[in-house]
Amino acid sequence: MPTLSLIVPCYNEERTLVACVERVLNIKQQGIDLEVIIVDDCSKDKSREIAARLAEQFTEVRLLTHQHNRGKGAAIRTGLLEAKGEFVGIQDADLEYDPMQYSSLLQVMRDEEADVVYGSRYLRPSKARRVLYFWHTWMNKTLTLISNMFTNLDLTDMETCYKLFRREIIQTIAPTLKEDRFGFEPEITAKVALAGVRVYECAINYNPRSYEEGKKINWKDGVHALYCILHYSAHRAPLPMQILLYFFIGLAAALVNIGGFTSLLAAGMDTGAAIALAFVLAAAVNYLLCIAILFRHKAFWSTTGELLAYLATVIVMGLVDYSLTKGLLALGVTPFWAKSWATLVGFVGNFIFRRSVVFREKR
């Protein structure tokens, strides 16, 4: 069994693939038994042919292929499931990362008895670095900060390519991975955090390439990464972060309620019907946002059971809101404060019901 399996996701990398594999194979000089798995993601250039020749030339190299383009995350997942090494890492084919540094990650893995080691671009080694895009770096650091807030890890570089895993750990996690593109990084980080394994970081050098040189990630991937952080981490996030996120969900639903009500009135709808329809729309938005970015959909109930539980809690909290508002008004509280207190109670009650009843999780 090889000591180290390196997954090389490849899409249109004909210019750098040979150099990448040759540099990866140099790891053997450090006494490391090696397996290199190139996963060609249906490249449009000659990458697949080059990879096939490399697999014929070197016994350490294996080639896996996708019949259609699925994305970097899908290519990595394919390789992770096929790896045979004691430790499994990821190596981009674009030469931004130096494969020889995997010896540092392996040393941390062994010395600290770690389960996962991240190679951080922001724990600075003592050498010069190439300076490129401020906003790209800022986006990476911001996404790492938000990821840490929801996973309760203390990483400096969640988006790094260099992640080293014990094979038994990653092959337990890999079948659950869903992200096919650059959402892989926040998803795998969330699931590593949920697994409760020992995570370490060590400094690595990084030689970024420009967009003119073939860099593929863009701002849309950053937005999707933010969604992935919430979608895969929020349901087990620290309670204050869940409450904060639910505040924004509630705010969005409230805006839909108000906007829908005023729009329906302006369209000539009866006041009572406008109130009811706007409330239903707001409840639907609340539910959809809850399952998209905060709680697990169908974690305990079936879809029907979950919707019925949600409807029941909406009715209960609607009655609480009505009764509390009427009661406070009867005690002489002004309408503004009566509704404000009822809204606060409703926010707390709705959150508790969502978390403990509607979207409860099996333990």
Predicted regions and their residues:
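A conserved hydrophobic helix/loop-capping motif in glycosyltransferases and polysaccharide synthases
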Residues: 4-13, 20, 27, 39
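Conserved donor nucleotide-binding strand/loop of the catalytic core
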Residues: 34-37, 48-82
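A conserved acidic beta->alpha catalytic loop
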Residues: 40-49, 95
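Acceptor/aglycone-binding surface of glycosyltransferases and processive sugar-polymer synthases
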Residues: 66-82, 87, 99-182, 209-220, ...
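Acidic helix N-cap motif at the loop->helix transition within catalytic regions
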Residues: 15-19, 45-54
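Hydrophobic helical membrane-anchoring modules
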Residues: 1-3, 152, 176-255, 265-266, ...
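Short, acidic, metal-binding catalytic loop of nucleotide-sugar glycosyltransferases
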Residues: 23-33
